[in-house]
Curated annotation (Swiss-Prot):
Binding site for heme b: 87
Organism of this sequence: Tursiops truncatus (Atlantic bottle-nosed dolphin)
Gene: HBA
Iron-sulfur keyword on record: no
Entries under Gene3D superfamilies matching the protein: Globins
Role, per record: Involved in oxygen transport from the lung to the various peripheral tissues.
Assigned protein family: Belongs to the globin family.
Domain Globin: 1-141
Modified residues (N6-succinyllysine): 7, 11, 16, 40
Cellular component GO terms, alphabetical: blood microparticle; haptoglobin-hemoglobin complex; hemoglobin complex
Binding site for O2: 58
GO terms assigned for molecular function: haptoglobin binding; heme binding; iron ion binding; organic acid binding; oxygen binding; oxygen carrier activity; peroxidase activity
Protein's UniProt name: Hemoglobin subunit alpha
Length: 141
């Protein structure tokens, strides 16, 4: 459960990402594909080369979904319901991949926002991304 301090940390950090959210989303995806090659199976139709338009496009989708989640941090299940349905029923993404992408996103944010990425912010973002992952996998049952 996200505490009030966690919510403040998440919102504050996300506001600092600003216009870079799509860029950071794409970078996190690239990082995931490089470090966890098994995740590529869901993207066999993508050009997975560095800087590909498809990775940038999907990075933007990831970033937009997270921006929506931050904006609805008190009601993640409703905010992410359609996305949860998509990943569970149509795409059938292995739930572990959400954890892998979350890890890669944390690394990306730590690299780009080193002064802001304090231990408490790291913990808050980790809890937030775990909450998002839980919602996205809730309809797998």
């Amino acid at each position: 459960v996200l505490s009030p301090a966690d919510k403040t940390n998440v919102k504050g950090t996300w506001s600092k990402i600003g216009n870079h959210s799509a860029e950071y989303g794409a970078e996190a995806l690239e990082r995931m594909f490089i470090n966890f090659p098994s995740t590529k199976t869901y993207f066999s139709h993508f050009d997975l080369g560095h800087g590909s338009a498809q990775i940038k496009g999907h990075g933007k989708k990831v970033a937009d979904a997270l921006t929506k989640a931050v904006g609805h941090i008190d009601n993640l299940p409703d905010a992410l319901s359609e996305l949860s349905d998509l990943h569970a029923h149509k795409l059938r993404v292995d739930p572990v991949n959400f954890k892998l992408l979350s890890h890669c996103l944390l690394v990306t944010l730590a690299l780009h926002l080193p002064a802001d990425f304090t231990p408490s912010v790291h913990a808050s973002l980790d809890k937030f991304l775990a909450s998002v992952s839980t919602v996205l996998t809730s309809k797998y049952r």
